Regions:
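Glycine/GP-enriched mid-protein hinge/lid loop-to-helix segment characteristic of carbohydrate kinases
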Residues: 96-98, 105-110, 160-287, 399
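Detector for glycine-centered tight turns/loop "hinges" at secondary-structure junctions
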Residues: 91-92, 147-149, 219, 227
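ATP-binding/phosphotransfer module of carbohydrate and carboxylate kinases, centering on a glycine-rich
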Residues: 2-98, 106-128, 252-399
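Short glycine-rich anion-binding loops that position phosphate/pyrophosphate groups of nucleotides
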Residues: 140-143, 209-210, 327-328
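Glycine-rich phosphate-binding loop and adjoining helix at the ATP-binding site
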Residues: 93-96, 100-201, 332-343
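Short, acidic Gly/Pro/Ser/Thr-rich loop/turn segments
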Residues: 80-82, 142-144, 212
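Short glycine-aspartate micro-motif
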Residues: 62-64, 72-76, 132-136, 202-206, ...
């Protein structure tokens, strides 16, 4: 119900009755509870001046999300966009802070650094911690959100951490925590707040140093048996004088990503991915992207990605494929992928699948993940917010 109100501000109680099959009494009770908890608010709908006869009686009342009703916090762990952030109930970013991190090798130290930064950001805003639904963590790792563990990260060199990252963030913030692979976090964010709204089947390709995919089918993430779905970076491509984390020399990770672009431009003094060089990769790639003289090299990397997009489109038949990330959403990269899909694989505007650039940045995805998980789902802790609102009312009565 909250999802409907968020997606359609101004929806009436009668419309909710019809959509969800509620009785008028049930809809009134639910709306009253949400209003009392401060999560939604009522407002007078504007008069429809196109009708010949004016409506007589009480103004029509609509429901909308109270943007200050709840908040969500996020932690994005990346060499490119290391940030902590806060968004309101409509997904609007209201505060963020970059986190300077030069090493990601120790799981607990990394979690402590980011969660402490987030706690300070929350304190700086002055927002009551009781109004936060939770914390979303987006990072390059294989995750099992239901078990709250980071299982493996080739990118950071993490093994099964037995929940240490989750424990550290929860301990330092006191809030519910959801950890998710960055491609999946972006996919969920685009589905609710971005270009994939109202689309039930799509794929999102996140491209930065390496590439990964978040797949959504019937509005649910596809994780695979062991949570390994989406490893497009290991699709076979052209041979390169480089070596992937998996040991091969023909992965898309070496030709369609930032690592491949940096190597081709002579920015690397090594041919095998080195996780201790993550900050260098990020700084160098951002500089390359910012120089228009490199547009053709970036476009070529996008063309290489098309080799992976074609079989993915044929196998999954998504309505939309989103290219995201600092490299993936770059104009030259996107154009290269789009043109190669048309030239070599016959895709056009009449094809069943369309390509689009992502609207949500990785730095936004973490807090939007928390909002999606802990507000617009059955995991909303309504009683906590209802009690918080009641306590505020009691305080006002004695003020």
């Amino acid at each position: 119900m909250l999802s409907r109100i968020q997606a359609q501000p101004g929806v009436s109680r009668a419309e909710l009755n019809r959509s969800f099959g509620f009785s008028e009494m049930a809809a009134t009770r639910i709306a009253r509870d949400l209003l009392a908890a401060g999560i939604v608010e009522e407002f007078d709908l504007p008069e429809d001046n196109t009708k010949k006869t004016r409506r007589i009686g009480r103004p029509r009342i609509g429901l909308r999300i109270n943007p200050k009703g709840v908040y969500a916090a996020g932690i994005t762990v990346s060499a490119y966009y290391s940030e902590v952030s806060i968004c309101d109930a409509n997904g609007k970013m209201i505060a963020c802070k970059k986190v300077n991190n030069t090493s990601f090798e120790d799981v607990v130290q990394t979690a402590r650094l980011y969660s402490n930064a987030l706690r300070k950001l929350i304190q700086k805003t002055g927002i009551d911690i009781a109004r936060f639904v939770g914390v979303g963590v987006a990072l390059s790792a294989k995750t099992t959100p239901g078990q709250n563990r980071n299982v493996r990260s080739e990118y950071f060199g993490w093994l099964n951490d037995q929940g240490q990252f989750w424990d550290e963030v929860q301990k330092n913030t006191g809030l519910p925590v959801e950890i998710e692979n960055i491609a999946n976090a972006l996919a969920l964010s685009e589905m609710r707040f971005g270009v994939a709204r109202d689309i039930s089947d799509f794929a999102l390709v996140h491209v930065a140093t390496f590439a990964g995919v978040g797949v959504v089918s019937e509005n649910r993430l596809v994780r695979g048996t062991a949570g390994d779905a989406g490893r497009i970076g290991h699709f076979r491509s052209v041979e390169r004088p480089l070596r992937c984390t998996c040991g091969r020399t023909d992965c898309l990770n070496l030709s369609a990503t930032g690592f491949g672009v940096l190597a081709k431009l002579g920015k690397l003094d090594h041919d095998t991915f080195d996780r201790t060089q993550l900050p260098f990769y990020a700084k160098s790639l951002l500089a390359v992207i910012g120089d228009k003289a490199n547009a053709e090299h970036i476009r070529e990397a996008g063309e290489h990605l098309a080799v992976g997009l074609d079989p993915m489109a044929k196998l999954l038949a998504p309505k939309l494929i989103i290219l995201s990330g600092y490299l993936g959403a770059n104009d030259a990269y996107f154009e290269g992928a789009l043109q190669e899909m048309a030239a070599s694989f016959g895709y056009d505007q009449n094809s069943g699948v369309q390509l689009a650039q992502g609207a949500v940045s990785p730095s936004e995805a973490a807090s939007l993940l928390a909002l999606h998980t802990f507000c617009y789902s059955d995991r909303l802790d309504f009683e906590r917010f209802n009690q918080s609102a009641a306590n505020d009312d009691e305080g006002s009565a004695y003020a």
